[in-house]
Curated annotation (Swiss-Prot):
Keywords assigned by UniProt, alphabetized: Hydrolase, Lipid biosynthesis, Lipid metabolism, Membrane, Mitochondrion, Mitochondrion inner membrane, Phospholipid biosynthesis, Phospholipid metabolism
Gene3D superfamilies in UniProt: HAD superfamily/HAD-like
Function: Phosphatidylglycerophosphatase involved in the biosynthesis of cardiolipin (CL), a unique dimeric phosphoglycerolipid predominantly present in mitochondrial membranes and which has important functions for cellular energy metabolism, mitochondrial dynamics and the initiation of apoptotic pathways. Required for the stability of respiratory chain supercomplexes and for growth at elevated temperature, in presence of ethidium bromide or in absence of prohibitins.
Protein name: Phosphatidylglycerophosphatase GEP4, mitochondrial
Pathway given in the UniProt record: Phospholipid metabolism; phosphatidylglycerol biosynthesis; phosphatidylglycerol from CDP-diacylglycerol: step 2/2
SUPFAM superfamilies: HAD-like
Organism this protein belongs to: Saccharomyces cerevisiae (strain ATCC 204508 / S288c)
Protein family according to the UniProt entry: Belongs to the GEP4 family.
GO molecular function terms listed in the Swiss-Prot or TrEMBL record: phosphatidylglycerophosphatase activity
Matches recorded under InterPro entries: HAD-like_sf (IPR036412), HAD_sf (IPR023214), PGP_Pase (IPR027706), PGPP1/Gep4 (IPR010021)
Source lineage: Eukaryota, Fungi, Dikarya, Ascomycota, Saccharomycotina
Amino acid sequence: MNISGTLNTLRLLYNPSLCKPSLVVPTFNDLPIPIHDSIKAVVLDKDNCIAFPHDDKIWPDYLQHWETLRSKYSNKALLIVSNTAGSNSDKDYSQAKLLEDKTGIPVLRHSTKKPGCHNEILDYFYRNKTITNPKEVAVVGDRLFTDILMANLMGSYGVWIRDGVKVSANPLSKFEKKLYNFLGF
């Protein structure tokens, strides 16, 4: 269970705009590159964003766009943040290591699941001298209640991958889409 996600989602009761993305695109292939003129670093979710859920490689249809992203942003400016690979539930970080081998991009080792790991993300980019301000970070993900909420908590640019690799049957994901439409963002 993602306690961080559950507790942070309660913030939406008094501030629903925390789940409002800066940009909405159907799939990773629709992500503009560069993402925005001010963006110097990019956080990427893994499952159903750049990879099929629970897979460790870039979705084949996205490979060309992936390489375009990698040519625009350096390895220090790209960071995969997943609630599976690199999280405290990833024993010996074996999933993180495998994902790094397959993608060539660092995977954040984090003690708190999204959206609660936002300080660890910012620390990573500050330590690598990639950014000077959270506004220079784009968070790209398929979940409003984790990825986009985290982007807004960070004061960063949130890109919602609405449909992902496959349209999710997850009830929470379906609820997020209904809420997004209801709120009229």
